[in-house]
């Protein structure tokens, strides 16, 4: 699509820096660069050292000009990059002059949107740009770059082509039932192709689920009675003294958040106030916030003191209520029992696992640790990753919630097509289910996308990208 306006924005982070970059894209970009510098021409892809002048021919700054001639640019339009000195005063003065010469302020993600609009990249690749910038771990950054280079798109397009081909095959079977060279619905060919597509979707969905964990991380909450060692555990996992630790019960009175990376997984860790009955107004507010955090957690680490011979399941029942079967009213898949102060128990020659068997039998996993000696911490990290299903493949791909939603809807439509074929031999319904599956899968790369979806996606980008 041809855009009639020329957009500009500062492309480097706000603040002091050695270099500040202003990016322009659009039909006037080249002319603006010439007017700004007094030069008559620029050679594409060759850096030119220039001075930048205001309307009165005063020097605003000096630096490099890079010219990317359409369509051989990021956006597919004429693109100019002005590389001057960093610092907001110089950058804002230079940008204001660019606006005087006819450019408009770029909106969030507008450069990437134009690249998408001009078929320089698909929606998956555009999102991967933002995900690479926002990555909180090396694994997430690497996965985003793989998606940016088209690895994820290639997998989606392969299945999309198979869906289109199969849909055409089914429609041909309906339209030409008497042709000898066209197979019918009952010959097994269509079912075989459907099964292969189902297998491909299952594999891609599994990879995408790992990619979503890489991108978003998980929200993990530490909870338990006062003085159980929650804050000490947060410090152990964070590798630094983030929470105040004392022998006084109730030291933590509010939630404390820390983002850490363990085994490649980003964990948004929240320490909470100890759960108990209290008349202290401030502590009660902290406990209310703790329960709110617990309800929103992807995983709860229920910390208890091994030296106090606490039954963790009884503790969980006291804190969260008891089900009709006598077990805690809390989903075992979202709960990890953490026996702390293991060193104190073992120093006495006692076993730290005396209650573990009971918990395991009932489906509640227990890990015993010592924040003092770091015993059990590696096992806790491994159990945490396993609990949330984090097992990324070597060549993982970044993914978002909308990708998973689209993949699941595609799976549902393909499963429906298989059912219509095997049970009812209903060719028209098979073709319709395949059409819906094709549409759902195409949403991922942007082949089929509503304008409001595109607005939400590109609106979340930073200015200048």
UniProtKB/Swiss-Prot annotation:
Entry keywords, A to Z: Cytoplasm, GTP-binding, Hydrolase, Magnesium, Metal-binding, Nucleotide-binding, Potassium, tRNA processing
Subcellular location(s) of the protein: Cytoplasm
Entry's Gene Ontology BP terms: tRNA methylation; tRNA wobble uridine modification
Disulphide-bonded residues: none
Residues that coordinate or bind (6S)-5-formyl-5,6,7,8-tetrahydrofolate: 23, 81, 120, 465
Residues where GTP binds: 227-232, 246-252, 271-274
Function recorded in the entry: Exhibits a very high intrinsic GTPase hydrolysis rate. Involved in the addition of a carboxymethylaminomethyl (cmnm) group at the wobble position (U34) of certain tRNAs, forming tRNA-cmnm(5)s(2)U34.
Protein family per UniProt: Belongs to the TRAFAC class TrmE-Era-EngA-EngB-Septin-like GTPase superfamily. TrmE GTPase family.
Subunit structure: Homodimer. Heterotetramer of two MnmE and two MnmG subunits.
Protein name: tRNA modification GTPase MnmE
Organism, as annotated: Psychrobacter sp. (strain PRwf-1)
Name of the gene encoding the protein in the UniProt record: mnmE
